[in-house]
């Protein structure tokens, strides 16, 4: 009986450790994709800070509309 309890306890600990490892990996993955989206948004801003013409301004607006992290189009109007 004691062996069964020890085995069950060890099994639960292993399950808990594996569950936390998977959760940590998901959290890192989510952080990484959020970081990538922010980097992409910053790159779009850098590209269009000094637009050389109307065509680039329109491209800026299109890029901003397609980006989920873009809250406003202020940098496109400069």
From Swiss-Prot:
Keyword Disulfide bond: yes
KW Disulfide bond (keyword) present: yes
Annotated propeptide span(s): 25-28
Keywords in alphabetical order: Disulfide bond, Secreted, Signal, Toxin
GO molecular function: toxin activity
Coiled coil: none
Compartments, record wording: Secreted
Tissue-wise expression: Expressed by the venom gland.
Signal peptide extent: 1-24
Domain of life: Eukaryota
Modification(s) after translation: Contains 2 disulfide bonds.
GO cellular component: extracellular region
Family statement: Belongs to the scoloptoxin-04 family.
Name of the protein described by the UniProt record: U-scoloptoxin(04)-Er1a
